[in-house]
UniProtKB/Swiss-Prot annotation:
Belongs to the HAK/KUP transporter (TC 2.A.72) family. It is found in: Cell inner membrane. It comes from the Bacteria. One of its GO terms (cellular component) is plasma membrane. Responsible for the low-affinity transport of potassium into the cell. Likely operates as a K(+):H(+) symporter. It catalyses: K(+)(in) + H(+)(in) = K(+)(out) + H(+)(out). This is Low affinity potassium transport system protein Kup. One of its GO terms (molecular function) is symporter activity. The chain crosses the membrane at residues 9-29, 46-66, 101-121, 137-157, 165-185, 213-233, 247-267, 276-296, 337-357, 363-383, 395-415, 416-436. Disulfide bonds: none annotated. PANTHER family: LOW AFFINITY POTASSIUM TRANSPORT SYSTEM PROTEIN KUP (PTHR30540:SF79), OSMOTIC STRESS POTASSIUM TRANSPORTER (PTHR30540). InterPro entries: K+_transporter, K_trans_C, K_trans_N, Kup. Keywords: Cell inner membrane, Cell membrane, Ion transport, Membrane, Potassium, Potassium transport, Symport, Transmembrane, Transmembrane helix, Transport.
Length: 622
């Protein structure tokens, strides 16, 4: 390996530590404390401490190291990961009916992420700020205001991008993980017998001894692996090897040392259960640790916010969410984006959650159900990919799925039991997003089908216009067309009302391919349909943002010269009229109309100069 490659690998691995592992890396702030919360009724006794530590350790090994890093990360789409990517991969080589089922599962998984993303910033920052009650108990009433203040600052700076401060994320998180390791090692040295919990017999005996209560306690143990989906979702940014290298060399050892250090502290002083993480530190280090923990949780929150921006862009490009304004905050990095409506909706939800739950321990009950639900769906989708795409042996795939679900389903079931103590929150938020995504996709499809079902043949119309041409005016007209072989509504209405046609007519279709990026060479396909009509198909990946200026540039290189300021863009604007429906479809129609009215208009979506756009209205019944 060359020196340059080693330096590059080190830099990317460090960057992965700063972004990918923020959520799972801040879990030691609250996980072990929640295991002994009053919900489960466990006393701080050696066998219970050993049982929880053993469960946490083997959860990190089996779920993170084996399931995600070894298996799930094999399933990539041109290097990209994430639940929607896995959904699209799983649906490639199966029947349309089975594809529909997998799409529903994928959308449920994506919706779970929206539910989780509201909780992560709240519980992370609150658990860090709660260190104040250890350092200065009199400041306890200010935990909620301080948490809101920190997160307000974080959401405000989103519109400016995080490129400059983002350079500090990796060093800060590296210091954080080293601090976790040192604090834990210091405690383990004082009480080394805690290392016996590495033996899985303690986890097994914990279940045997405490039976049903131990099953309920899985709802707390799962807090140790929240954020595991980020490893897969951020695969496209950093690559598989750097993410794996960061986990096995830095993150996993640091987490294990810290959890076992907290366990050693509890064996020595059971009273430390009120906040075992901060009580690991000597008195002089409490304030620096509080500051470092706050920075780490802010970075973890930033990673989650960036993740929801990326997921939203992917959902928009794949047609599951209405078009919305997406602002690129970096000229160098296409992945750095800002979506105002998502940012401020998320901020409002996070603030309401902090005010409503007040303490991170109250919020912990709400955490986990979305994570484990996504884990179950990931297992099903991954095994479908292994069977249908990679042609693994069917019996091997069934065996693998059973092994994965033996781990996933008990954790999910344990968290479902927390439904009425907070689990309703991510489920409710996820349900809202699922309804929005399925409504937009299905109603949009029905609308386009209704608009095109009575449309005449495009080729026949062009032949008729060439044979008996209307009045021609100088210039180029571009008609946005959603389907390649359908006459654009705007063209029909222009001929109907204005009875003129431009010298050159371009029918432009934007197509989103099932890949993250499309190579520039394949960006534009041009077909001359007649002496005065051209069809242009512009292909983009779901990580890209369509841009008409770029399309015109590519057209010029292919021989079709179009000048932006000499071209008129004709677009149709549909006024939707709701027909008589059953009550549940009526409500869905109302939601679709509301989403359509607030969707980003095509000129803004494709960055077309407003003074070059002509919109022609039409009424459509839905």
């Amino acid at each position: 390996m060359s020196t340059e490659h080693k330096q590059y690998l080190s830099a990317v691995t460090l960057a992965a530590i700063g972004v990918v592992y923020g959520d799972i890396g801040t879990s030691p702030l609250y996980t072990l404390r929640e295991c002994f919360s009053g919900h489960y009724g466990f006393d701080v006794r050696p066998d219970v401490v050993f049982g929880f530590l053993s469960l946490i350790f083997w959860m990190l090994i089996l779920v993170v190291s084996v399931k995600y890093l070894t298996y799930v990360m094999r399933a990539d789409n041109a290097g990209e990961g994430g639940i929607l990517t896995l959904m699209s991969l799983a649906g490639r080589n199966i029947s349309s009916r089975a594809t529909s089922i997998l799409v529903v599962l994928g959308l449920i998984g994506g919706s779970f992420f929206y539910g989780e993303v509201v909780i992560t910033p709240a519980i992370s920052v609150m658990s860090a700020i709660e260190g104040l009650e250890i350092a200065a108990p009199a400041l306890d009433p200010y935990i909620v205001p301080c948490s809101i203040a920190v997160l307000t600052l974080l959401f405000v700076i989103q519109k400016h991008g995080t490129g400059s401060v983002g350079k500090l994320f990796a060093p800060v998180m590296l210091v954080w993980f080293l601090t976790l390791a040192l604090l834990g090692l210091r405690s383990i040295i004082a009480n080394p017998e805690v290392l016996a919990a590495l033996n899985p017999k303690w986890a097994i005996s914990f279940f045997v001894e405490y039976k049903s209560v131990s099953f309920f306690a899985l709802g707390a143990v799962v807090l140790a692996i929240t954020g595991v989906e980020a490893l897969y979702a951020d695969m496209g940014h950093f690559g598989k090897f750097p993410i794996r290298l960061a986990w096995f060399t830095v993150v996993l050892p640091s987490l294990v040392l810290n959890y076992f250090g907290q366990g050693a502290l509890l064996l020595k002083n059971p009273e430390a259960i009120k906040n075992p993480f901060f009580l690991l530190a000597p008195d002089w280090a409490l304030i620096p640790l509080l500051i470092l923990a706050t920075l780490a949780t802010v970075i973890a929150s930033q990673a989650v916010i960036s993740g929801v921006f990326s997921l939203t862009r992917q959902a928009v490009r794949l047609g599951y969410l209405p078009p919305m304004r997406i602002i690129h905050t970096s000229e160098m990095e296409s992945g750095q984006i800002y979506i105002p409506v998502i940012n401020w909706t998320l901020y409002l939800a996070v603030v309401l959650v902090i005010i409503g739950f007040e303490r991170s321990s109250n919020l912990a009950a709400a955490y986990g159900i979305a994570v484990t639900g996504t884990m179950v769906i990931t297992s099903i989708l991954f095994c479908t990919v292994a069977w249908k795409n990679w042609h693994w042996n069917r019996f091997l795939v069934v065996f693998l799925l059973m092994v994965l679900l033996i781990i996933d389903i008990p954790m999910f079931s344990a968290n479902v039991l927390k439904l009425f103590s907070g689990g309703w929150l991510p489920l409710s938020l996820g349900l809202v997003m699922f309804i929005i995504m399925t409504t937009w996709k299905s109603e949009r499809f029905s609308l386009l089908r209704r608009m095109h079902e009575h449309s005449n043949s495009l080729e026949a119309m062009i032949a008729s216009l060439e044979k008996s041409p209307p009045v021609r005016v100088p210039g180029t007209a571009v008609y946005m067309s959603r389907a390649m072989n359908v006459i654009p509504f705007a063209l029909l209405h222009n001929l109907k009302h204005n009875k003129v046609l431009h010298e050159r007519v371009v029918l432009l279709t934007m197509r989103t391919d099932d890949v993250p990026y499309v190579h520039n060479v394949e960006r534009v396909t041009i077909e001359q349909l007649s002496p005065t009509f051209w069809r242009v198909v512009a292909r983009y990946g779901w990580r890209e943002t369509p841009n008409v200026a770029e399309i015109f540039h590519r057209c010029g290189l292919e021989g079709l010269s179009c000048q932006m300021m000499e071209t008129s863009f004709f677009m149709s604007h549909e006024s939707l009229i709701l027909t008589k429906r059953p009550w549940h479809l009526f409500l869905r129609g109302k939601l679709f109309i509301a989403l359509s009215r607030n969707a980003l208009r095509a000129p803004d979506q494709f960055e077309i100069p407003p003074n070059r756009v002509i919109e022609l209205g039409t009424q459509v019944e839905i």
